[in-house]
């Protein structure tokens, strides 16, 4: 399935919802669980900052547990030309319409995940992955290629099964990988 996404800020979890999110069945809380093999999410703008998929929760900041924006299930996930960000501890700046920006929820950095991926052969091209602690960009895929992507995070953030080709990596901590014995490479 191909999903084309027009420039805008799309909240996967309502940032104005004051309810504290809790996980189910022993898992962390998720913004959206997606079960769809060969899902392609494609931003309709070459600048990934102009198509934003966002959340605004983290551990103890709107959630009990490490809030994760997406939980993808299926082989062949592809994301392209967009930003996937958990803006719990990072300001969201949207260049096309400033009023869609949002100040970070809290300056105290907490676990705020972007996405888990249960499957194989995942691919990201020209995507900005933004969060801080435990960013987890498509974490869990058996194999994933990040091509020309941008990563912003602190510790325990990069997936151990990813290959990062021509990516820019901005680390604000000392240990970007949570695990590195699974075949990942930069």
Model-based region annotation:
Residues 1-186:
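Sequence-level preference for short, compositionally simple segments enriched
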């Amino acid at each position: 399935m191909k999903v084309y996404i027009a420039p805008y800020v799309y909240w996967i979890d309502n940032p104005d919802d004051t309810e504290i999110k809790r996980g189910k069945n022993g898992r962390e809380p998720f913004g959206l669980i997606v079960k769809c093999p060969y899902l392609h999410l494609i931003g309709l703008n070459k600048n990934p900052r102009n198509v934003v998929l966002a959340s605004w929760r983290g551990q103890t900041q709107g959630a009990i547990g490490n809030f994760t924006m997406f939980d993808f299930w299926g082989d062949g996930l592809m994301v392209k030309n967009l930003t996937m960000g958990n803006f719990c501890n990072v300001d969201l700046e949207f260049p096309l319409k400033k009023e869609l920006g949002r100040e970070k929820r809290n300056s105290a950095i907490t676990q705020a995940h972007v996405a888990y991926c249960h499957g194989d052969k995942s691919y990201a091209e020209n995507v900005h992955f933004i969060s801080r602690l435990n960013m987890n960009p498509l974490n869990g895929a058996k194999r994933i290629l990040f091509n020309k992507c941008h990563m912003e995070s602190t510790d325990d953030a990069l997936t151990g099964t990813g290959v990062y080709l021509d990516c820019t990596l901005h680390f604000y901590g000392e240990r970007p990988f949570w695990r590195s014995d699974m075949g990942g490479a930069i």
